[in-house]
Swiss-Prot record:
This is one of the proteins that bind and probably mediate the attachment of the 5S RNA into the large ribosomal subunit, where it forms part of the central protuberance. In the 70S ribosome it contacts protein S13 of the 30S subunit (bridge B1b), connecting the 2 subunits; this bridge is implicated in subunit movement. Contacts the P site tRNA; the 5S rRNA and some of its associated proteins might help stabilize positioning of ribosome-bound tRNAs. This is Large ribosomal subunit protein uL5. NCBIfam families: PRK00010.1. It comes from the Bacteria. Keywords: Ribonucleoprotein, Ribosomal protein, RNA-binding, rRNA-binding, tRNA-binding. Transmembrane segments: none annotated. Part of the 50S ribosomal subunit; part of the 5S rRNA/L5/L18/L25 subcomplex. Contacts the 5S rRNA and the P site tRNA. Forms a bridge to the 30S subunit in the 70S ribosome. PANTHER family: 60S RIBOSOMAL PROTEIN L11-RELATED. Gene3D superfamilies: 3.30.1440.10. One of its GO terms (cellular component) is ribonucleoprotein complex. It comes from Janthinobacterium sp. (strain Marseille) (Minibacterium massiliensis). Signal peptide: none annotated. GO terms for molecular function: rRNA binding; structural constituent of ribosome; tRNA binding.
Length: 179
């Protein structure tokens, strides 16, 4: 079992139950999934970019991402329907907790001028989104072997009903909030 998963069951559930006065253990919010999404607008010109991005995301997440395709044609962006324009991977269970552990303890401190993540990036339904500008903050990516710096969106989906509950859940996992 992953370190954060054990920590959740042993400590976080009890703390959140006391803080929010839940009647049942099943009411305590938990993380459902973590989605990593990489949008690649420059992939229209060169198909190799998708392959490199898939390789990077595979190393970061530990499982193979799905290539996302354009749903409809947009002439202004020179995109036709069905063109590969990004890749995404959804993590659940043990993989999700392992990734979250690496993200909080190793990757986030490697961000340049890091002062904490914003506490206002919740969507109103208890889910949290964070943008990463460079994939090299992850230790699995070797700086010498990348072709370009790419960012990604990391979306953490929880069962929390409010943003306050979700923030308390992530703060219990030692998420470095700025405010």
């Amino acid at each position: 079992m992953a370190r954060l998963q054990e920590f959740y069951k042993e400590k976080v559930v009890g703390d959140l139950t006391a803080k929010f006065a839940y009647k049942s253990v099943m009411e305590v919010p938990r993380i459902l999934k973590i989605t990593l999404n990489m949008g690649l607008s420059e992939a229209v010109a060169d198909k190799k970019i998708i392959e490199h991005a898939v390789g990077d995301l595979t190393k970061i997440a530990g499982q193979k991402p799905v290539v996302t395709k354009a749903r409809k044609a947009i002439a202004g962006f020179k995109i036709r329907e069905g063109y590969p324009i990004g890749c995404m991977v959804t993590l659940r269970g043990a993989h999700m907790y392992e990734f979250l552990d690496r993200f909080i303890t190793v990757a986030l401190p490697r961000v340049r001028d890091f002062r904490g993540v914003s506490g206002k990036a919740f969507d109103g339904r208890g889910n949290y989104n964070i943008g990463v500008k460079e994939q090299i903050i992850f230790p699995e990516i070797e700086y010498d072997k990348i072709d370009a710096l790419r960012g990604m969106n990391i979306s953490i989906t929880t069962t929390a009903k409010t943003d306050d509950e979700a923030k308390a859940l992530l703060a219990a996992f030692k998420f470095p909030f700025r405010n």
